Amino acid sequence: MINVEIIKNYSKWREHKQINKALIKKITQKTLSQFDNFSEIKQFELSILLTNNEEILTLNKQFRNIEKATNVLSFPANELNWQDLRFSGNEIASSNKPIILENLGDSDYMHLGDIAFCHDVIYNESYEQQKTFENHFIHLLIHSILHLIGFDHQNDTETKIMENLEIEILAHFGISSPYLLIK
């Protein structure tokens, strides 16, 4: 089970009724199902902030020391490393080491972390990239969940692995690769 708490701090998010707890749970479940490590965990928790340029700018400055609005920020609750994950039946190579869950407390429960989305940046990007707002949001949600479980894009190898996972998960929802449009 995935518990999702959503805080909407910006009225324009109300225009996107399709972005709701049910959608976020479905996307989160599909993303986590890519890894055998999470199959034993019975309950996940995820907090979502749907906000505006002003608040995301404040968060980006406070936590990343970048004075610029961004589309999404991810705040992992745990220090995980993607190289410790076991992929479920896809082609991406990784280690077969079990992820260490003992230090997370109750192994039946895992707080994934917090994600903050900026409506205006996502809206502008989706317009510029000729995507629907919802599809762009779904892509950013998958991207953010991968960050919460230890993925990053600090080098070309990590970037390619992360992008391939995103493309694979998006395809499950009938969404084309977002990287074909922006590269």
UniProtKB/Swiss-Prot annotation:
What InterPro entries has UniProt attached to this entry? MetalPrtase_cat_dom_sf_prd, YbeY, YbeY_CS
Subcellular location, record wording: Cytoplasm
Keyword Acetylation annotated = no
Cofactor-binding details, from the entry: Binds 1 zinc ion.
Q: Which Gene3D superfamilies does the record cross-reference, listed alphabetically?
A: Metalloproteases ('zincins'), catalytic domain
Residues involved in Zn(2+) binding: H143, H147, H153
- Give the superkingdom in one word: Bacteria
Q: Which cofactor does it need?
A: Zn(2+)
Q: Main EC class of this protein? A: hydrolase
Sorted alphabetically, the keyword list is: Cytoplasm, Endonuclease, Hydrolase, Metal-binding, Nuclease, Ribosome biogenesis, rRNA processing, Zinc
Please provide, in alphabetical order, the Gene Ontology terms of the cellular component aspect for this entry.
cytoplasm
Q: Name one GO biological process term.
A: rRNA processing
The EC number on file is 3.1.-.-
Q: Which GO terms describe its molecular function?
A: metalloendopeptidase activity; RNA endonuclease activity; zinc ion binding
- Record-annotated disulphide pairs: none
The family line of this record is:
Belongs to the endoribonuclease YbeY family.
Q: What does this protein do?
A: Single strand-specific metallo-endoribonuclease involved in late-stage 70S ribosome quality control and in maturation of the 3' terminus of the 16S rRNA.
Protein name according to UniProt: Endoribonuclease YbeY
The gene for this chain is ybeY
